[in-house]
Amino acid sequence: MSLFPVIVIFGLSFPPIFFELLLSLAIFWLVHRLLVPTGIYDFVWHPALFNTALYCCLFYLISRLFV
């Protein structure tokens, strides 16, 4: 359980995990933009799978911070 309450915006209720997902997505975009120029994707076998795993790891780290 998260310590944050459900947030209501314009009558729509959002669980706390929604904002954790958005935060991890923003960090993923930043990390992705930093990794592309380094050429690390030349060594990655499946870029879409790598991106998915990277996002899942970032989401896990963010969600552990807020619990």
Swiss-Prot record:
Keyword Cell membrane included in the entry's annotation: yes
Subcellular localization(s) per the UniProt record: Cell membrane
One Pfam family this sequence matches: DUF1656
Transmembrane segments annotated in the record for this chain: 3-23, 43-63
GO cellular component: plasma membrane
InterPro entries recorded: DUF1656
Protein name per UniProt: Protein AaeX
Native organism taxonomy: Bacteria, Pseudomonadati, Pseudomonadota, Gammaproteobacteria, Enterobacterales
